[in-house]
């Protein structure tokens, strides 16, 4: 069930109002600028494995409203319905192109569409599948869902896949408390560094 609307502090509201206009503008510019890269990746996916270019999955967004997240498909068609829920470094379900775009985080680029549509933000807690929040308290879920989910966030630059689920939630809650333009820029810079170094990727 979707969480009830959270009561967000005055500090969070005043540090958050600028995010949507900035996200809309930056995602729109990025979609135009990166259109050639989108085309190249799309062609490589289509030429090397049968199936759609995009992978869609239902996630929980603002106020835990469900939405479809977009990624470039990196696994063989039907692999998400069988086998382990999470992938490993040498997962046979991942295609050759899939390994490359995962390692470089290029598989996340289509989430610019989610940002442009208002479903996500550049920076924020990652959008979860419902079962990933089963151990979170109702208060933690409400607070976490009081902001739009992000392509990257504090947890992702603080350990990413090496963190426990509770540690990720704790980082998410810390982000909600400290949300500001300066904080988002700091996380964005750290994210770019990690992507360049291919840190924390499968």
Regions found by a protein language model. Give the residues of each.
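A short, structured surface patch at a secondary-structure boundary
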Residues: 87-148, 188-195
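Short, glycine-rich, amphipathic interfacial segments at transmembrane boundaries or analogous
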Residues: 55-93, 151-170
